[in-house]
Amino acid sequence: MLCYENCVEFSCFENDLDAFIPEIWAKSALELLYENMVVAHLVNRQFENEVADYGDLVHAQRPADSKLRRRTDSTTASTLVQDAEASDIQVPLDQWFNQTFIIRPGEMSKSYVDLVSKYLAPRMKMIARGIDRILLGRVHEFLGTPATRAGVLAAMDEDNAYETMVEADKILNDKNAPTDGRSLILSSDAKSKMLLCDKFVKASERGDGGSALATAKLGHILGFDTYMAQNTNHCHTGADISADATETTYAAEYAGTIALASNTVQEGEYVNIAGNDQPTWATDQQTDTITLNEALKYAVENAAVVTIYKACDVDASLQTGTTYAAGYAERITLDGYTANKGPQVGQLLSFGKTAETRHTYTVIEVEAINTTSCYVLLDRPLEKAVADGDDLAFPGPYGSLCPAMCRDALSLVTRPLAAQNGAGMLTAVQDAYGIGVRVAMQDVINQGRVVSIDLLAGVAVLDEDQCVVVLA
């Protein structure tokens, strides 16, 4: 049940225009948002009832870490006292979600319940989807090294699913992550693969009596409360790829150059070598060899299939100075890819060809312009400028990036936007359970009533040791 901190109770009738009260709509908006979010319930949420604007830097708290102390009769108090304050980090409020719509005069006589169902519910589902996508979109920041991630890309099956989860559990334990409150968030593909494994569905081996199978949920697996989220990072087949093959065998942990048969790789492109199956990319390309950004995790056979995820072009021609500046938060135009093989929602997208210049995002929305160009919206504003023609975009590899995490790995930080009453506009700001929503209403002559819903937020990585990425 939602607990409202700043709500006023109103009553309205089914066909009463008094139902157009912003406070009532804001309360319903929060209820719908709360019901439709998945990932936001599994992370740290921080809210303060202080009005903020888009782009403001606000302070979030990272839980403090204390050390073991031993006391004797002669121990002085000064050596025992530890700082109990959580460390402070700055978080930009760079996620401004908005849904605006018009209720036409002919619709305004409908009941409040009908108006909510037709207009408000689908908009709040869209905002909930956006919140989950920006949270899951930060999963790449936890990829770490081959030793600190579990599984293989696009190759989870009934034979290795259990071992993958054992590996993820061990990695978190080795990082001293809390053992309580762990969550595993799976893509639909990863869930379907896990359900093929007997150890996840047999009651005697699950440890939960098998009730999860009866309710079509994965339930509690190896210490993880397990969920399927449709917004989990995942790239399906159909990406713009080319194929190559290795020229010899390579041992696990090999970190040198890799010889390819034809070598059409460009620096910066994601390259997946069968047998290794990690989210690797090329940092160097010579006539017949490439160098990857990290050592191989697993051994690679001779003539192993090499999948190259082809770069596409950045088109900033509509921007002043033909550059998407650092901090740019709107749609980015990409083109130059093979017809109908553009970037996908949930796919990684990187810029930069070296470790120093690389910055990586997740695509959270795609709108096609034509068969070879599209608009993409990223999980957060650009960290660095991207220039038209000079910079390439590098779409990520097939497979899923599923976070296995504790609550304090990520934080959703929200602040209320200012109420703006006047000039025919009525506004209400409501908050509950660490989330604030603003609803504004204004009549437009002969047009109807414009309703605008806003939510201002930021996402912070609190502790990289509290999340491991499960590749699937």
Predicted regions and their residues:
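N-terminal "assembly arms/tails" that initiate or stabilize quaternary assembly
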Residues: 2-91, 467
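Short, low-complexity, charged/polar segments at coil/turn and helix-coil boundaries
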Residues: 42-54, 59-69, 159-204
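Short acidic, glycine/tyrosine-flanked loop/strand segments centered on an H-E-D-like triad
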Residues: 85-111
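Hydrophobic, glycine-enriched assembly/anchoring segments
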Residues: 103, 440-472
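Autoprocessing Asn-cyclization modules and mimics
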Residues: 156, 200-203, 213-388, 470
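Long, low-complexity, polar/charged, intrinsically disordered or flexibly structured peripheral segments
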Residues: 376, 381-382, 393-414
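A conserved acidic, glycine/proline-rich C-terminal tail/linker
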Residues: 431-440
